[in-house]
Regions:
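Glycine-rich phosphate/pyrophosphate-handling loop used in enzymes and phosphotransfer proteins
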Residues: 1-199
């Protein structure tokens, strides 16, 4: 990814929803996207808007296994977002079938690269027990991920949960709920990209 391409990735400019990080018309604690919903994470932040260029980058490292793009995406995140005030990073686990087909977990690659940038440990604290495919899913299908995760160990600390793209927040919230139930004091969500809908 050249410098020009990196600069062309859409920035997510304030004002933002304080909770989910959605672009808003004026600063709010919770926007229409997340108001009235149970959200288990303290806040979510993304480095870029999910446009055609960001989508190409994400799909290239997810489906084609281009490790260098995960590293470059992490560099963009580290450049555009401040390090989270946490004790460790973890990642949204891929479902077993997809992980075996790809030979890797895209969110784990991103998290491990970010851990290097931010000098934080990265630990596999979750496993997926059901479901997994979000691309092409309807909003209701995306929100049906409750109970999709299990904690692999207690998490009595502050955690940053890393994923590639924030769409509805359902996956992030379901994973955060599991981390909180396992003892995490707080969970922040960090993604490379997020769907852009000014609310």
């Amino acid at each position: 990814m050249c410098t020009g391409c990196r600069e062309d990735l859409p920035r997510i400019e304030p004002p933002l929803c304080a909770r989910c990080g959605a672009p808003v018309v004026w600063p709010v604690e919770r926007c229409r996207e997340c108001a009235g919903r149970r959200i288990a994470f303290a806040q979510a932040r993304a480095a870029v808007g999910y446009d055609a260029a960001a989508r190409c980058i994400v799909l290239s490292w997810k489906e084609r296994g281009l490790r260098r793009l995960a590293a470059e995406a992490a560099a963009v995140v580290a450049e555009r977002l401040p390090p989270p005030d946490v004790d460790a990073l973890t990642f949204v686990p891929a479902d077993r079938t997809r992980r075996l087909a790809r030979g890797h977990n895209p969110a784990e690659r991103l998290a491990r690269e970010l851990a290097h940038h931010w000098e934080l440990p990265c630990e596999p604290l979750l496993e997926r027990v059901r479901g997994g495919r979000q691309r092409g899913a309807t909003r209701d299908e995306r929100r049906s991920v409750r109970g999709a995760f299990r904690a692999t160990s207690p998490s009595p600390r502050r955690i940053a949960l890393v994923d590639d793209v924030y769409t509805t927040g359902a996956t992030a919230s379901a994973a955060s709920t599991t981390l909180r139930a396992a003892g995490a004091r707080s969970v922040e969500v960090v993604t490379f990209a997020r769907a852009l809908r000014r609310v």
